[in-house]
Structure formats: structure tokens, C-alpha cells
Amino acid sequence: KPKFSKMEPITNEPNIVSGMIKKSDGDSIPGLVLLIKNHKGEAVRALKTNALGQFSISTPLVDGIYTLEVGSTVEDTTFDIITIEVKGEVIPPIELIGKEA
């Protein structure tokens, strides 16, 4: 289940996925690859976090069920696969918080 941030969405456009990837201690993680996969498990977007650990897609996803998977590794940190439903609404920023391995 996704953890939504209290931050305002970066856009009012529906079906735009954005958020932040953090370590368990709250530190942001720059340069991580995030994959957004459709219900068939096919990657439909690949993103890289910026210097602040933030990510965002620039074009909206088609309505449906998607998973967010951290595609690169971080020393001693693992991430759950997050499932989201996209349904023509503004999506609040999502926080992916790592767990100590």
C-alpha cells in the first residue's frame, strides 16, 4: 500500500506519479532508478531520482493498476514493491522508504 506524502502534488494534472525515495533514517537517495510497471509486469516508465531523492513522470499514465519498483540497489537497504491504482485523479506524492536489510 502506498504511503502518500503530505506535500502538495507538483501538478494538478491527473495520473501523474511523483514522490520521493528515502532511507529508513529519512535521508533522501539521489540517482536511484524507479520502474513503473503495468498489470502485465511490463515497464512503462523508468525514472531516476534527482539530487533531493525526488522523482516525477512528465506524461500521464493510462488508467489502471501499476507497481512502483526501485530498480537499483542501495547498500543495506531494501524497498517494498508498491501497488497504485491510477484512475483519472490527481495523485498525491508517494514516499518510498527503505528498510534496513
Short names for language-model regions:
Residues K40-Q54:
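Short, acidic Ser/Thr/Gly-rich low-complexity loop/linker segments typical of extracellular
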Residues E42, I65-E85:
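A short, solvent-exposed loop/turn motif at the edges and junctions
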Residues G53-I57, P92:
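Short strand-edge motifs at loop-to-beta-strand transitions and within beta-strands
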Residues S56-T67:
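Short Pro-Gly-centered beta-turn/loop motif in secreted/extracellular proteins
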